[in-house]
Amino acid sequence: MPEHTGFLTYLLAQLPGLRENARNIGKTFIGHHTVDYRGTEPIFMSLLIMVLFVLLASEVRGQYRRLNESVIPEDKLTLRTFFEAFFGYFYGMARDVMGPANAKRYFPLIGGSAAFIFFSNASALIPGVNPPTSNLNITIGCAVVVFVLFNYYGLKENGWSYVAHLAGPKWYLAPLIFPIEVISTCVRPVTLSIRLMLNIGVDHLVASIFLGLVALFVPVPLMFLAIIVIVVQTLVFCLLSCIYIGLATEKADHH
């Protein structure tokens, strides 16, 4: 903070920049915004995170090969044990929600979503990096993939009875229930994407404000809060995805 400047005056001087940061959160290509580095940055960061994850997965695969040659298992946290705990937890969650058979069948979607969202969220901990999941384009893309696939899985498992099931058990209630069910199903990707974008974007914005005001020590508690937000939002997205897939693939009760 410059000399002979009050704290309130200094804070007010930062407001134009903070407002600009707030406007950039969730900016999409659909509006009247020109595509600049702010628009391409989330895409670049998403690609970078996916490449990084592939490299880490390759390293873990190499560790498994070396593990087969060793007699004593590792007793410390390594990249391999972290991946085991990470994907083991989400597989257990999918098994509890969808059942063992569906968890094994649909875990590639859940595990892939968990990895991408977690590492994208975690990039917010790096100073100067805007997490891809703070942009609505990226979160909508993730949510649309889940939306398309759980409907595809539902049609694959139950056929057209999956669509008929949306009309409810009684035919005379179908004109009322069917539109409500269709709307509630179509709203799912909207709520998934907006919830993730707002939580990560606002958390990152608040952390940026405090880092701009006080660079040392004070933002440390916010970093712990950010870690909680990162984990919770990954869990929420994947848990809801499991629920949607479970509801879509359960055998319809015909009346």
Curated annotation (Swiss-Prot):
Mode of membrane association: Multi-pass membrane protein
GO cellular component, one term: plasma membrane
Pfam families in alphabetical order: ATP-synt_A
Biological process annotations from GO: proton motive force-driven plasma membrane ATP synthesis
CDD domains hit by this protein: ATP-synt_Fo_a_6
TM spans (from-to): 40-60, 109-129, 135-155, 163-183, 196-218, 230-250
Keyword Zinc-finger: no
Top-level taxon in the UniProt lineage: Bacteria
Record-linked SUPFAM superfamilies: F1F0 ATP synthase subunit A (SSF81336)
Disulfide bonds: none
Main location per the UniProt record: membrane
GO molecular function: proton-transporting ATP synthase activity, rotational mechanism
Keyword entries, A-Z: ATP synthesis, Cell inner membrane, Cell membrane, CF(0), Hydrogen ion transport, Ion transport, Membrane, Transmembrane, Transmembrane helix, Transport
Subcellular location: Cell inner membrane
Annotated Gene3D superfamilies: ATP synthase, F0 complex, subunit A
Protein purpose: Key component of the proton channel; it plays a direct role in the translocation of protons across the membrane.
Subunit composition and interactions: F-type ATPases have 2 components, CF(1) - the catalytic core - and CF(0) - the membrane proton channel. CF(1) has five subunits: alpha(3), beta(3), gamma(1), delta(1), epsilon(1). CF(0) has three main subunits: a(1), b(2) and c(9-12). The alpha and beta chains form an alternating ring which encloses part of the gamma chain. CF(1) is attached to CF(0) by a central stalk formed by the gamma and epsilon chains, while a peripheral stalk is formed by the delta and b chains.
Entry similarity comment: Belongs to the ATPase A chain family.
NCBIfam families: ATP_synt_6_or_A
Protein's name in the database: ATP synthase subunit a
Annotated source species: Sorangium cellulosum (strain So ce56) (Polyangium cellulosum (strain So ce56))
